[in-house]
Amino acid sequence: MSDLKDEIVNKSFFLFLNKGYKACSLKDLESATRLTKGAFYYYFRSKEEILKAGIDKYLSVIGDISETEFLQIGSLKLYIDVIMEQKERSAETLLRMFDFFIIEVAFFQLVLEVSSLFPEYRSRIDELSKGRLSRWEFMILKAKQQGEIDVTLDTSVLARNLMSVSTSMLNIELGTENMSFVFSDMRMQFEQYYLLIKR
């Protein structure tokens, strides 16, 4: 992608995440990038095309560890560490690619907003979320069987609670460069949950 085209995607995607896709006009995008309408149409035929480029760029980075790696994780505590490491690596990669920090939940909200335009992205996010929930449930059951955590806890509820820890980042300003605070806060929340449930 050329530098200018990449800049259009990055600055437009930042606006889409902050204001919402429908709330952003082409004028807003022109203003953010300091380009004319003609320059936009040289690189992109529509606002939808810019959005698609941003979503594709984001999706090229997020994902989960392989099934083989997942099955080798021996404890819930270790799984939490793996999740944290993966989230930090993904966030660093996205920061380099977009020039701003993207909160995962903001991305998911954007995908939900544009699901009528791009239902395939909604399906992909739904699939990703279901897969993550399933893995949390698997690790919780394994931890119960191994005596790592309290067996009386509801597996499904605990899985949803642990999976939602990343939403604690909602109060962080989109685009913040202080990722270390975001991830230390997330790690602290995971640690507190773990202290409450371990045997």
Residue ranges and their predicted role:
Residues D3-L4, I8-K11:
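N-terminal positioning helix adjacent to the helix-turn-helix/winged-helix DNA-binding module
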Residues E7, L15-K57, V61:
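Helix-turn-helix
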Residues E85-E88, R96-D99, V105-L117, Q192-I197:
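Helix-loop "lid/cap" segments that line or gate small-molecule binding pockets
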Residues D99-I103, Q109, P119-Q146, V157:
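Amphipathic alpha-helical packing segments from all-alpha helical-bundle domains
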Residues I103-L112, V151-E173, D185-Q192:
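Hydrophobic alpha-helical segments that form the core
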Residues A53, E67-I103, T155-L162:
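Hydrophobic alpha-helical connector segments
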Residues V82-T93, S134, F138-Q145, S164-S168, ...:
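C-terminal peripheral helix-coil segments that are non-catalytic and often amphipathic
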